[in-house]
């Protein structure tokens, strides 16, 4: 089975251990072997809450430079849509992964970070659960790789 790895780094100051990785779409750096892992995702686009057809695995860790996410989508290469789009393009025709973060865990402010398999990025901010703006541009880096 082919897979695609969508990996990105959020440049948000968060103190923890001192790591050093290369942002290259490859999860072979030693830090990834000790990273926290999330699995068991459900489909939310469309909002069916069904188990997805293909497995997704998320790894994450922090260091003194930021928060790192490594996302592996186990998806046949023949079904992968690899297109590059303008930054913040919501209607991009490409496979993508979203990470949404609510640092206060109270729905007062949330941050969305999206990367497509073609390395296009999108970021936005949500305020009070439903006020949305994509005029907010964070400093962050992403690189994807398809196998």
What annotation goes with each model-predicted range?
Residues 19-147:
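Structural preference for beta-rich elements and adjacent junctions enriched in aromatics
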Residues 1-5:
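Positively charged n-region of N-terminal signal peptides that target proteins for export
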Residues 7-17:
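Bacterial N-terminal signal peptides
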